[in-house]
């Protein structure tokens, strides 16, 4: 009897599993908010050089008149946001003269700071620390620092969970998220903000990895797809929730508090979660595993079945799992054989490009000239049909085709969007939304596809590699936006080209629909080579038939 059958005996998808999954989905709502938080907390309001109050008051000039006299025009014919004249051009006061000769006048960066519009935001980190003009790239850097924390968290907290358990690391991650998020809200300067956001990113990885592990290891195999989809939809709802919270909280510090304080509640009730019995057995803690299984059986109303579980029965039921645990495998096994190496290379590119393009679009909402709150809702809502389509296509068409089409179609749409004139904002927004939906479908597919491609003995290592590549994509994505300052079309070309290239690499991956999960590397190698041998045999038989027909004169007549 396997551990999956043992779970069915103790209630299957019972009251305990339903309660646990529900409680773990609440934090996922706010994980989406933290990932996309800088769309609002680091939004850039309209701004201009701050007026010298003493000068324009003493000269009987209103504020707009002062701006006209003190700032040159930019390429769009508007007062420049970053430059001012060295000397105020008082000679054009009270006239209709323009800045025709402004290029010949001496200018300098704003000396008094900046004035920011409060039409949409009361306060952001941009207005707090003047992250504009010469410091504007710090906005993208802050998001990359956060994604760097997500990467480091995946490496450190993911590894520690295999040593100290999923439950302990999940509890710690909730606490770290609450504290670091709280500290971010009270950051006195940009440097401390980046440090606390880095720690927040680490905690987010710990929550994501250990939540997934506890859900998967406590629910029966038959409902894993459903619970995984539920978690995915929770993330999507979280994107809609962020738009509502940001609309209500126009101050970035209050918004940061709003998405961080609930993690103290999650931290408190997470002590109720039991440790993964599967992990306990594989870690040699069978006695505690028996206690946890009995507790779960009791909660599911299967107390009699729980009493039948003993140390001996638990060990005998998990012989296969224990045998796999005793085998020694390392990250090197991900590239040791030709087939696994091909799978690892292709999946690494798929994960990188999906995350890279996804966050490149999702973190650039202000460029659509639409209400940032509305576009956040639209970008979040498109994930619902995308994930429904992806799930349906995976079942009826297959994983390979779904993955390939979602990447190539998304990449082509994003690439084409770079050629649409900026005046056609409705078309540009619609294409961006469609492209983001394709990438959401890709994310939904690649999680399951990766799990099915890697054998049991190196599955966690494979997922770890792919997760790392996705984090690197998330780190690089904001930095590519900086190129747009020099070549406006270039970011979309890069965001669109990456999914197309990775989509072509999917051609080299095998189909996994309706096939049992492989347990060993040898099993994967045989599964790939078997169809090739079968095709070779069919070709040989076909050639022999043709040769036989040529040698037989009756066949020639016929």
From Swiss-Prot:
Transmembrane ranges, per UniProt, are 16-36, 141-161, 168-188, 198-218, 226-246, 254-274, 343-363, 370-390, 401-421, 429-449, 463-483, 489-509
The UniProt keyword set, sorted, is: Cell membrane, Membrane, Transmembrane, Transmembrane helix
Topology class, membrane: Multi-pass membrane protein
Identify the PROSITE patterns for this entry: MFS (PS50850)
Give the free-text PTM comment from the record.
Glycosylated. Glycosylation is necessary for proper targeting of the transporter to the plasma membrane.
- Record's keyword annotation contains Membrane: yes
Where in or outside the cell?
Answer: Cell membrane; Basolateral cell membrane; Basal cell membrane
Q: Which residues lie on this side of the membrane: Extracellular?
A: 37-140, 189-197, 247-253, 364-369, 422-428, 484-488
Name the segments for region: Disordered: 539-558
- Record-linked PANTHER family: SOLUTE CARRIER FAMILY 22 MEMBER
Q: What does this protein do?
A: Involved in the renal elimination of endogenous and exogenous organic anions. Mediates the sodium-independent uptake of p-aminohippurate (PAH), 2,3-dimercapto-1-propanesulfonic acid (DMPS), cidofovir, adefovir, 9-(2-phosphonylmethoxyethyl) guanine (PMEG), 9-(2-phosphonylmethoxyethyl) diaminopurine (PMEDAP), ochratoxin (OTA), acyclovir (ACV), 3'-azido-3-'deoxythymidine (AZT), cimetidine (CMD), 2,4-dichloro-phenoxyacetate (2,4-D), hippurate (HA), indoleacetate (IA), indoxyl sulfate (IS) and 3-carboxy-4-methyl-5-propyl-2-furanpropionate (CMPF) and edaravone sulfate.
Family assignment from sequence similarity: Belongs to the major facilitator (TC 2.A.1) superfamily. Organic cation transporter (TC 2.A.1.19) family.
Q: What is known of its domains?
A: Multiple cysteine residues are necessary for proper targeting to the plasma membrane.
**Under which name does UniProt file this protein?**
Solute carrier family 22 member 6-A
């Amino acid at each position: 009897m396997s551990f999956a059958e043992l779970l069915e005996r103790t209630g299957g998808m019972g009251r305990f599993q339903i309660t646990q999954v529900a409680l773990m989905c609440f934090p996922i709502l706010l994980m989406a908010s933290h990932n996309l938080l800088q769309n609002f907390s680091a939004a850039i309001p309209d701004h201009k050089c701050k007026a010298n109050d003493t000068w324009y008051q003493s000269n009987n000039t209103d504020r707009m008149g002062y701006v006209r006299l003190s700032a040159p025009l930019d390429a769009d014919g508007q007062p420049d946001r970053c430059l001012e004249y060295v000397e105020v051009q008082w000679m054009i006061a009270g006239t209709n003269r323009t800045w025709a000769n402004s290029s010949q006048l001496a200018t300098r960066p704003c000396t008094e700071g900046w004035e920011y519009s409060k039409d949409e935001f009361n306060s952001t980190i941009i207005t707090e620390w003047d992250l504009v003009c010469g410091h504007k790239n710090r906005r993208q850097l802050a998001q990359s620092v956060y994604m760097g924390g997500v990467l480091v968290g995946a490496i450190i907290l993911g590894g520690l969970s295999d040593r100290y358990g999923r439950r302990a690391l999940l509890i710690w991650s909730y606490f770290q998220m609450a504290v670091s998020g709280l500290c971010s809200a009270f950051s006195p300067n940009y440097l401390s903000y980046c440090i606390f956001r880095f720690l927040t990113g680490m905690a987010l990885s710990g929550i994501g990895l250990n939540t997934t592990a506890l859900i998967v290891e406590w629910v029966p195999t038959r409902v894993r797809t459903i619970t995984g989809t539920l978690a995915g939809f929770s993330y999507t709802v979280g994107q809609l929730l962020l738009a509502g919270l940001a609309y209500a909280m126009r101050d970035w510090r209050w918004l940061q508090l709003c998405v961080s304080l609930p993690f103290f509640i999650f931290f408190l009730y997470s002590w109720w979660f039991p440790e993964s019995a599967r992990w306990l057995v594989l870690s040699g803690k069978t006695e505690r595993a028996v206690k946890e299984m009995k507790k779960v059986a009791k909660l599911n109303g299967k107390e009699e079945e729980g009493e039948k579980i003993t140390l001996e029965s638990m060990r005998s039921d998990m012989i296969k799992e224990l045998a796999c645990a005793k085998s020694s495998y390392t990250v090197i096994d991900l590239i040791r054989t030709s087939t696994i190496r091909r799978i690892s290379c292709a999946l690494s590119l798929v994960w990188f490009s999906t995350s890279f393009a996804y966050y490149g679009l999702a973190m650039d909402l202000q460029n659509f000239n639409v209400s940032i709150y509305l576009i956040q809702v639209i970008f979040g809502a498109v994930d619902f049909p995308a994930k429904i389509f992806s799930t349906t296509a995976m079942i009826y068409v297959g994983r390979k085709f779904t993955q390939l089409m979602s990447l190539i179609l998304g990449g082509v749409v994003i690439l084409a969007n770079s050629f649409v004139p900026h005046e056609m904002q409705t078309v540009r927004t619609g294409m961006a939304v469609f492209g983001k939906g394709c990438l959401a479908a890709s994310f939904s597919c690649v999680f399951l596809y990766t799990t099915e491609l890697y054998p049991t003995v190196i599955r966690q290592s494979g997922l770890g590699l792919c997760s790392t590549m996705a984090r690197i994509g998330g780190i690089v994505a904001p930095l590519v936006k900086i190129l747009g300052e020099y070549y406006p079309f270039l970011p979309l070309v890069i965001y669109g080209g990456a999914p197309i290239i990775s989509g072509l690499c999917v051609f080299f991956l095998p189909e996994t629909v309706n096939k049992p999960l492989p347990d060993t590397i040898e099993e994967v190698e045989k599964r790939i080579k078997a169809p090739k041998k079968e095709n070779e045999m069919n070709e040989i038989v076909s050639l022999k038939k043709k040769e036989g027909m040529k040698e037989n004169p009756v066949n020639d007549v016929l």
